[in-house]
């Protein structure tokens, strides 16, 4: 639009596209933003909310799709193994419990770099991989940064996508170098019990 006129909004763009195609109603997810819904309604479009999942075809996977997901997850396994080996081979500086690799402190950035290299060699991208230590590990989706320490939880969460197929994998593991504190051991036991309960409930057709 010209500078003296109001800039086009997302609702304007959607309305124009629908008008050009003689579309008068749209099926939208039940969680569709109410503000945008009202704007589209004002522009003459009827919205029909649909139950989740919105894309029903995503409920099932073909054999080839399942195989591709398994392949990407196998690559993810390799990346997690590389992170594990780096932590395993690190040394503990007993004065302050800092982890070292050679003469350098082991950092979240170095672990993430190691993970990324494995993924890139397999044509996968690991965006926003999490390597979070200590208090940072308690903040969901905190990427983590800086030096890693012994005796503290180290969360590693890798969720790469294949650059060719677009399929994702996801894996999270909690590591602790050296002796784990009792509080962390108790937390592990609780999570392990919950995990076992979840596995027993998993079967085809369960919502």
PLM region spans:
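Active-site neighborhoods and metal-handling regions in enzymes and metal-associated proteins
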Residues: 1-207
